[in-house]
Amino acid sequence: MAQPQNVPTFKLVLVGDGGTGKTTFVKRHLTGEFEKKYIATLGVEVHPLHFHTNFGEICFNVWDTAGQEKLGGLRDGYYIQGQCGIIMFDVTSRITYKNVPHWWRDLVRVCENIPIVLCGNKVDVKERKVKAKAITFHRKKNLQYYDISAKSNYNFEKPFLWLARKLVGNPNLEFVASPALAPPEVQVDQQLLAQYQQEMNEAAAMPLPDEDDADL
């Protein structure tokens, strides 16, 4: 079957501290993993993730750092022409959340006013350290937030759906078919996830704390 022409395609910049699960997350999408390309000059892997919506196909070219962030900052070439972003932290590691403002600053410095989703990964791990009430950065900066678990596929599609709606400018856009995902490596405790969702809802209703140095 011939590929439809002119599939809307967006550059998605995936950032966050090393070890937060960014590569694990992007590799869940099997066709994207199969079709990825390596850009040697920047040391990045670009994964084309296709999603089928009620308005046709959409593609995110997800730029993954391939671990460079562990060696220091990322070069501007990584961010240039980024049309949307995902900032990832690890809910079992407070320092990765504390560093979110630095990643956000880098993103908006180069990409300016793009839609960004903040994702707290590894919610399948029982020892959660970054609790819902501590996650306020997205509210201060008008980002979307999702708890995710890359290894279990929990909420995998949510960040992409939110970004697609923003980029296309249509809140009624829906994904009509699930992409082929790698089988879950871990199981999530549904009761625990329901509790987390409840805590997020309650936290969202609370007034924001005063600005503190950690979020500057």
From Swiss-Prot:
Residues 6-170 form the Small GTPase Ran-type domain. PROSITE patterns: RAN (PS51418). The keyword Cell division does not apply. InterPro entries: P-loop_NTPase, Ran_GTPase, Small_GTP-bd, Small_GTPase. One of its GO terms (molecular function) is GTPase activity. Residues 36-44 are annotated as: Switch-I. Keywords: GTP-binding, Nucleotide-binding, Nucleus, Phosphoprotein, Protein transport, Transport. The modification Phosphothreonine is found at T20. GO terms for cellular component: cytoplasm; cytosol; nucleus. It holds the Pfam family Ras. GO terms for biological process: poly(A)+ mRNA export from nucleus; protein import into nucleus; ribosomal subunit export from nucleus. Its main location: nucleus. CDD domains: Ran. Residues 67-83 are annotated as: Switch-II. GTP binds at residues 17-24, 67, 121-124, 149-151. It is found in: Nucleus. The keyword Phosphoprotein applies. GTP-binding protein involved in nucleocytoplasmic transport. Required for the import of protein into the nucleus and also for RNA export. Oligomer of dis3, pim1 and spi1. Found in a nuclear export complex with RanGTP, exportin and pre-miRNA. Interacts with fft3. Belongs to the small GTPase superfamily. Ran family. NCBIfam families: small_GTP (TIGR00231). This is GTP-binding nuclear protein spi1. It comes from Schizosaccharomyces pombe (strain 972 / ATCC 24843). The gene is spi1.
